[in-house]
């Protein structure tokens, strides 16, 4: 059995088409979760890693009554594996996993925070593994446009949407966000090394609020080693940090 060990929880990493990855961990660490948040949604939860990181972050604060972190996934195996990971974690009381596509998800609540690490290989050749294709190709499954449309109507007042995408999709993401009344408050561009262009972008949107976004950059590697900036971010999660 494939298990990824974090400092405070383990992730079964076998049945989900998309495995534990740096993108998801960074999204969970950087998403603007607040102690007052009660309803949190992870769209395309996969193994549940993002939701688990968020739960660990909340565990350092008094968790309010009624707090729920929900992870949804279109893939039955992924949702089942996330459910196992949630139930075996220290925060099983606030985590729940659902097998459902976003298009059919009709919750009876709004959300204070929505996060997603959606598929992003728009122009890639179709993956021969149908489940991985759904997990990785926007044409086959979940798209950030669908997420933006959902967030427009489902974010509570003051709610936030946080998405990680390849950096070359940032302009389109911001443009479509504006079309749905969502405006960026924070933009974090991620570089593998300083000399290269950013490879990923984490954008946080707020519903209805217009402001000049806070922009920052994270460099992961320098001279063959992890940067202090990166290690400082992941030190509570990865065993190597």
Range-by-range predicted roles:
Residues 37-44:
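Conserved class I S-adenosyl-L-methionine
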Residues 48, 52:
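Glycine-rich SAM-binding Motif I of class I
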Residues 118-146:
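Mobile active-site "lid"/loop adjacent to the S-adenosyl-L-methionine
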Residues 197-241:
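SAM/dcSAM-binding transferase cores
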């Amino acid at each position: 059995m494939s298990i990824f060990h974090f400092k405070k929880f383990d992730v079964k990493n076998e049945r989900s088409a998309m495995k534990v990855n740096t993108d998801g961990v960074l999204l969970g660490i950087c998403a603007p979760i607040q102690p007052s948040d009660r309803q949190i949604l992870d769209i395309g939860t996969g193994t549940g890693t993002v939701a688990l990181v968020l739960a660990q972050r909340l565990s350092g604060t008094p968790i309010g009554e009624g707090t729920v972190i929900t992870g949804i996934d279109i893939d039955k195996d992924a949702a089942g594996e996330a459910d196992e990971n949630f139930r075996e974690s220290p925060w099983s009381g606030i985590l729940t996993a659902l097998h459902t596509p976003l298009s059919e998800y009709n919750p009876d609540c709004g959300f204070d925070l929505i996060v997603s690490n959606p598929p992003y290989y728009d122009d890639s050749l179709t993956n021969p593994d149908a489940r991985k294709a759904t997990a990785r190709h926007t044409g086959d499954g979940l798209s950030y446009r669908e997420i933006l449309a959902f967030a427009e109507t489902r974010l509570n007042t003051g709610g936030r949407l946080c998405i990680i995408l390849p950096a070359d999709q940032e302009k389109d993401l911001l443009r479509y966000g504006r079309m749905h009344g969502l405006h960026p408050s924070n933009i974090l561009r991620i570089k593998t090394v300083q000399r290269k262009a950013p490879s990923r972008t984490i954008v946080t949107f707020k519903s209805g609020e217009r402001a000049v976004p806070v922009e920052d950059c994270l460099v992961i590697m320098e001279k063959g080693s992890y940067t202090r900036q990166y290690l400082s971010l992941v030190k509570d999660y990865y065993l190597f940090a």
